């Protein structure tokens, strides 16, 4: 059997607005705990809807209750597990970390400033010491033997060596612009010379005269300077050796040149304006006074014949 949807016909009748009647029942306890909430029950009666049909509608009553818990933090008084931050500012951790980083940077800056200051001071002291040593080099007083000690003796030796070096440099600078001692162009007799012979002994004597003249001039210039007086026997010995080498030059004439007679030598010197042979040379006398003769070399065939004949022993 099939049921069909039956749609009844409803006719609406105009009427006035219904009146709403509400009844509220509330019960209140004398003592309520903190976590209890007043529950209210409300019941409402809805108006009934009447129609010309056979259907009716009725209202329902509903009741609801909500429980809300109140949260209160525990007290920090006497509790060792809770940090009492009431008397501390906000962001204490960030302040501490920033203070540590700032202290590290400040210490690095102080170390850099101190190291620069010390290095600059050390450099200035060294440069001042070197400048003062170069400025007052040689201007020192020689202490007596009673007041001297090994340290002072070593200092005096170093100062004397420095003075000698400075004097040698000064002397070399004085003679840098001077003419070379063995330059034949400076010979005043070159224009009047008829031969090509050059006398080195004459040039040596000229150099000796110019050297003595320059030396006397230097002594007159620096005679008032006490820093140039170096009282050492090494200086005197070197000066004597230098003078001996200039006074006794080696013979520069060729050994193959034949000896001439005295009369011919005098005419030769007058003609060529040369002093060769007039100055006694120690090396020449030593060579002429030696009685030994060089061994005569033999041909290989003659030496072999002497060996075969028994006149020569190997």
UniProtKB/Swiss-Prot annotation:
Family: Belongs to the PRM5 family.
Biased composition (Basic and acidic residues): 254-269
Transmembrane segments: 93-113
Residue span of region Disordered: 32-61, 240-309
Record keywords, A-Z: Membrane, Phosphoprotein, Transmembrane, Transmembrane helix, Vacuole
Protein name in UniProt: Vacuolar membrane protein SCY_4732
CC per GO annotation: cellular bud neck; fungal-type vacuole; vacuolar membrane
Chain positions with Phosphoserine modification: 148, 254, 274
Location of the protein in the cell: Vacuole membrane
Coiled-coil positions: none
InterPro entries: PRM
